[in-house]
Amino acid sequence: MRFVRYSLDGSAGRGVVVDDLVHECSGGNGGPGRVVGRLAELALLSPCDPRTIVCAGSNYAGQIAEKGRPWPERPPLFLKSHNAVTGPDSVILRPSEVRRLEYEGELAVVIGRTARDVPADRAADFVLGYTCANDVTAHDWRDDGQWTRAKSADTFCPMGPWIETDIADPSALRITTRLGGRVVQEESTSDMVFGIGELLAFVTRWITLEPGDVLLTGSPAGVGPMVPGDIVEVEISGIGTLRNTVADRG
């Protein structure tokens, strides 16, 4: 099943995609209700509205090798703020003070039920589904030690286009990032250092995650700069493609 959020007549709604139509979510199970419109004609929002966004760094073998970093003993974690969230086809805004803005294509895990002290082997029971994300980073702010600012500026967490619930094996997905149509990142989620179960178990020992919260699972090798006018796409097999443009914030 694919869940979306959309904007219609000035209001946000939640829907289920059936073929090329979006139906209202109805009832306690969130199943399809009346038809809202065609998927291609609706303005999609981020498919979830998380209270908490927990992110894993240095979690792909390719990126660790590329950067010459030591293999982490525990998942390196950081947070992105709620205001960073934006949706598919929206604009990523580069602050005027930022000289180098970077893309980081990632698999996002969307939480489906309250998760606290989750055993790694039961992680799937707490997951609603998966979506594409771009962990946008202001490289120069990160390097001066201001990680919160570097990761959490407005529009620095695009997600979408929808939440895909029917993923049999999230450890066997292909992440591809394109910049202006050129492939700049490509790696399998099987190359994660810490799998989704390990990450969720580690995070929820201290942080309770609620339905709609998000766990970003790290970015493959090939992280690089993007500039105003660029179109950046994050495609994940079995899910879809998240597409955004870059512009100056002014």
Predicted features by range, described:
Residues 97-101, 151-154:
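Short Gly/Pro-enriched turn/cap motifs at secondary-structure boundaries
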Residues 55, 102-104, 210, 227-228:
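Residue-level recognition of short, solvent-exposed, well-ordered loop/turn junctions
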Residues 116-130:
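N-terminal accessory regions of nucleic-acid-interacting proteins
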Residues 76-94, 116, 155-160, 216, ...:
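Short catalytic-site patches enriched in acidic/histidine residues
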Residues 80, 105-107, 111-113, 131-136, ...:
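Short, structured patches in soluble enzyme cores that scaffold and shape functional sites
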Residues 26, 35, 43-47, 63, ...:
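Catalytic-pocket segment enriched in acidic/His residues
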Residues 2-96, 103:
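Extended, compositionally biased flexible segments
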